[in-house]
């Protein structure tokens, strides 16, 4: 998917020195790139028995919601703590300098739901692992994690596969971090 990869800009030294930030806003601004991205996911996941798509705040919403619409299934927003109004279930995870918490509504998942988990990118995998654990608490089966970008040098997709047996599909990869 070199077309999609070519539409993603790299911002050096953001958010801190030494980081190469992979910015998907340039992809989102490009109608051809956006259509190709969503179309790639639709082609991969249609007719797979997916019952819901879950997206991780905030950029996972950008592919997850339109994909759920195209697949004819519901969308589950996975939010940061305190952002959902009804009863929630939460999962804590480690950050580079501390901890964070993500939540979903308790009634968002039915036991046996076959969930596709979406985000824009997987790096170290911390947020994605927490999201998988959160969905599994409510009885979901995770079909796969779909991302636009994998940063394989940071090991997140490998951890997700090895620790939780959840495969990761990425449209493109970038070396480094």
Curated annotation (Swiss-Prot):
Gene3D superfamilies: 3.40.50.2020
Reactions this protein catalyses: AMP + diphosphate = 5-phospho-alpha-D-ribose 1-diphosphate + adenine
A single Gene Ontology CC term: cytoplasm
Family matches, as PROSITE patterns: PUR_PYR_PR_TRANSFER (PS00103)
Coiled coil spans: none
Keyword field contains Glycosyltransferase: yes
The protein's annotated pathway: Purine metabolism; AMP biosynthesis via salvage pathway; AMP from adenine: step 1/1
GO terms of biological process kind: adenine salvage; AMP salvage; purine ribonucleoside salvage
InterPro entries in alphabetical order: Ade_phspho_trans, Adenine_PRTase, PRibTrfase_dom, PRTase-like
Compartment annotation: Cytoplasm
Leader peptide range in chain numbering: none
Entry superkingdom: Bacteria
Function noted in UniProt: Catalyzes a salvage reaction resulting in the formation of AMP, that is energically less costly than de novo synthesis.
Protein name as annotated: Adenine phosphoribosyltransferase
Organism: Leptospira borgpetersenii serovar Hardjo-bovis (strain JB197)
Organism phylogeny: Bacteria, Pseudomonadati, Spirochaetota, Spirochaetia, Leptospirales
């Amino acid at each position: 998917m070199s077309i999609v990869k070519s539409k993603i800009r790299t911002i050096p030294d953001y958010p801190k020195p030494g980081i190469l930030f992979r910015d998907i806003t340039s992809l989102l601004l490009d109608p051809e790139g956006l259509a190709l991205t969503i179309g790639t996911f639709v082609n991969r996941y249609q007719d797979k028995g997916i019952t819901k798509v879950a997206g991780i705040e905030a950029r996972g919403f950008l592919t997850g919601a339109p994909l759920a619409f195209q697949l004819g299934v519901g969308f589950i927003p996975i939010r940061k703590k305190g952002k959902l109004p009804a009863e929630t279930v939460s999962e804590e995870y480690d950050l580079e300098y501390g901890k964070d918490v993500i939540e979903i509504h308790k009634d968002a998942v039915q036991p046996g739901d076959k969930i596709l988990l979406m985000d824009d990118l997987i790096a170290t995998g911390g947020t994605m692992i927490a999201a998988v654990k959160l969905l599994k608490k409510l009885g979901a089966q995770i079909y796969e994690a779909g991302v636009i970008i994998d940063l394989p040098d940071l090991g997140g997709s490998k951890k997700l596969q090895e620790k939780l047996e959840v495969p990761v599909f990425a449209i493109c990869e970038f070396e480094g971090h």
